Amino acid sequence: MPDLDLSPDALLSSGSRLPAVTEWLTRAVWSQDRFATLPREDYLRSGEAAVARAEELISVGASRAWDELAAETTRAPTPRAFLGLDREPATARAPARAVVVFDGLSLRELPLILALAAQTGFRVDESRVIATSLPTETLDFVSQRVLGPDAARGIGPNQLPSVGALTARGVQAVYLDSLTPRISLTAGKSLLLWSTYPDRLFKNDQARFDTQLFPQFCEYVATLWKYTIQAVPPGVPIVITSDHGYIFFGGTAESARESAAADQLGQQRSCVFEDAAPYPAPHPDLQRFPAQHRAMLRGRLKTRPKGTASRRLYQHGGFSLMEVLVPWVLLNRN
């Protein structure tokens, strides 16, 4: 197998390091060739180990790349903008478009998405890596990237079908919580389809083996594709994206360094500090957002929360390459 390690030269650039990192992720680590030729568990294990080594390099010698990643979250395209929800006046309607959010979809699944598009007669007009909202949690994505100024605090994806600001703009939101949902999509309307997969699999407390969840999701996707992408009416452009990625902690995909950063966050991957609480001092393993009184754990440090959450091999909520960087794929039917 060719060497997957990120070249240190990519992190020594005087300019932005992030373009080289994202190119390495999609062309070397999570490449279509590796996905097509390797057993699923080997693809997962070797890829995550390579990303873990890269994140350690960034953490100990190129921390400016973390700040670049934080800045990139403010420049990424959003489902809200793609669906025309920022148009004025509030009743203005954009041409019909569709956004399909696969909850928890990561860059490791991008080759699978591209392969399915080719197999089912879709043209890939754009495939890129974007930085999702911070923190890397579902409710924050809904608030920041979907509803924006229309958001009420704490709206979850299952509530999107009843959000008046979407229906007023001619957007039909559908929450898909099964592999084979029975849905009726209205022709002429923009669509926001939210699938609970792969999140439904990856947050399973009982799934302890790296060979179990990722291959299982790969098997499920063909069915999900039929009830999401292929269900969109012809002629409607479709964006596939995700609210957050998942970091994998199986095998060697975990930092062995000792760090006090996780303790400062109460063994959580992200924490908001009350106004009266002491805010963490700068630390190489913390991404700090003082204006929001928030701090997030950088890279591959594994938290040790109490309870069953500590056993999860797949986690999100923190500030790592695999949690923050997600796919953005634009499809049209051939």
Model-flagged regions — what are they?
Residues 1-334:
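Feature captures the catalytic ectodomains and active-site-proximal regions of enzymes
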